[in-house]
Every structure is written in structure tokens, then in C-alpha cells.
Amino acid sequence: MQSLRKSLLQFVFSGASMRRWNDKLRPSELYEVDKQGHKMITAFLLYRLQCRKLGMEEQLKLGREVIEGALFDYFYRLVITDIKPPVFYRIRENEEQYRQLTDWVLGELEPRVRPLHEDFWQRLVAYHSRPVQELTGHPSTADRILRAAHLYASRWEFGLIRPLNHFDEEADEIELSFNRELQSMCSLEGVPELMAGTGNALVRTANLCGQLRFQIRWSQTPRIPETAVLGHMFIVATYAYFLSLSLGTCDARALNNFFCGLFHDLPELLTRDIITPVKRSVATLPDIIHQCEEDEVQRRIFQPLAEGGYADIRDRLRYYLGLDAGSEFKETIRGADGTVQEISGFDELNDNCNANRLDPKDGKLIKVCDVMAAFMEAHSSIHNGISSPQLFEAIARIRGEYGRLVLGNFNVGTLLADFD
């Protein structure tokens, strides 16, 4: 039986404590989960550019390969956390050593991942069992998208720490390596723009999104780890994809749910993370905040994208943010002409609209994943010895509001009870 378990949620969340550039002087801590969020936002932009020349089935296939390839790489990275990239690349050059390391990693991943979905697990095994020559000599389009996105997000981080590490003998070589490898990928549409700097609307969007790693959630509540908005969005996206697999959604719905989770807090780049009690303090405040967010997103992201020749990307982001339905947490489908139609609820979407041609997107499922990620933040901090009344209140509120909720074959309360 397919099931989403506590151990997998915690495993994904553990990237919030995994420091990056740990051997360099850093202006602030940089965490793996934030880098993964930035990487996947960049990968989305590159993916949508490739979709311009693909049919629907090819788009869905490529989208699944991009998302799952990113998750498979992230899982591997979490297991080999202490191996620096140069050392890992040396290991990968020796096929026998790489196979032994991969066999060990798969053994660590199996009890966490396999219960979620057997086919997903088999795809993970196949992904990490590919010959090294295939990865380096004949990469797929998805591989190239993910590699370029990884390089861009890592180079972005390095740009933060470079001025502080003028004494570091490795700094020049690291910078040269990033630029050289990105330059070698310029045949992939979108990469030349990433190399060109912030004058392009595509790069400006990726750059703005990267700044969400500086915005700490629960900013007035001490926590360990102190998750940022960027990492939170990646965690919500990952949970949404897991739930989509567990529910047996169509490919379009699974992809839409991942990307909706990935972008659901994008407007907070422009208005900051406003905590739930404040939002609920005045009856009209949520509407005021929502309108401010929509206006700012239109001015700083959507309008530049449209004017820069990326109206198709703007339209997808509008759909994920639920701007035509009033909220990202509403179930929607899209007609052949692109018209967005709101669906009455989860059951209606799940029973009657689970088809690629309808381009379905969940609402309540995304909200549940958002709440589960917040629950993980509060629960993990308390477990790590940092507690406060606000964290206990958040856990109690989530249990009270979602403890009896059932989405298809997924019982939210049963999963929450595993954390007792």
C-alpha cells in the first residue's frame, strides 16, 4: 500500500539544517534546502522555454523528468552530506567506487522512499544506476536543465561569499569553473540569458526569487532550524508531489501541484511573511494584503516578463498563484483556450477532473502541504530544544483544524498522529 510517512517528511526537511559552503567565510548561513528551491525555480524557467517547441505529452514527460531528477539528486545529496563536491566527482570517475557508494545510498533511501510509491522508487533506482558516461557524455534535456540550474544557483551563492574570501586560494578557480561550465551549456535555451546578468527579465526573476533565502519565517519566534521562505517553498512543493503520487494523479496535476507549491509564497518577496494571527486580526486585512501582493507581483515580475518576451511563463505563474481564481488554494482547471475555471472542491477535482487535457491543479492539497511544512518547522524546533508558546499554539491549531481531514486515500490526522 502506498503511504506518505513521517520518516520521509523529516528526511526532506533535514536539508534545512544542512549548511553549504561550510569551509568558506559566509555573510550569513546558507542551507541546502534554500539552494534546492532556487535551483528548481531556475529549472522551471528553463523548462518552460524548452516547452515552446514540444507537444503536450512531451512537455509532461520532460517536466516529470526535471522534477524527479531534482528530487533524486537531493535525496542522494542528503545521504552523502559530508562529501565535498570535488571529492564526489573524483569518486564518480571510478565506476566501481561510484557503484559501491550508490548501492549504499540506495540502501539508506529505500526504507524512507519505497513505501511512498513503488514506481517512483524504481525510477529513483534506475536514475542513480545510469552509467557515468551517460551523465557526462550524453546528458538528456532534463539533465542539462538541472545541471544549468544547479550551476546558476550555486554561482549565485558564491557571488555572496566571494568578496569575503579574497584570501582563499580556491576562489578564483571556483568562479572560473562555474563560468566555464555554464558557458559550455549555452546551446540550451535560457542559459545565455543566465550568463548575461540581471538586465534580462528571466534572470531578474531568478535573482529576485533567490533573495527569498534571506527572509526567515516566524521571524519573531526563536527556532532551530530557522527556515527561510525559499526553502519552505521547496519543501511544500516536494510534499505536494509526494501526495500527488500517493493519490495517483495524472501527470499534469502532479506537475502543477509541485510548481504551485514551489511558487505559492512568491508574493511574500514583496510584502514579507505575515504570520497567521496578524492576518486574522482584522477581518479585511487578508484582502488588503492579497491585493498589495498581486499589485507588486504584477509590477515587478509579471509585467517585465511579458515585456521581455516571456508572456507564456507569466501565464503559468499566474495559474500557479491562483490569481484568476482568487487564491492558490483553490482547485482549478484550464480550458483549451487557457480560460481558468474554479472547481467546487478536492473531491470534484479528484473524481471528475483528473485528466491531463484539463491541466488540473489542486488547492486544498497545496494548503495541507503548506500546513505540514509549518508543522514540521514547529515540531522540529521543539524536538531540538527550542520551544515557545507560539510553536505549541501552532501545533495545537494545526492538529485541531486538520486532524480529521481526509483527501482521497490520505488521512492527514493519521500522519500528524505519528508525531505524538
Where on the chain are the PLM-derived regions?
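Alpha-helical, largely C-terminal catalytic domains
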Residues: 1-420
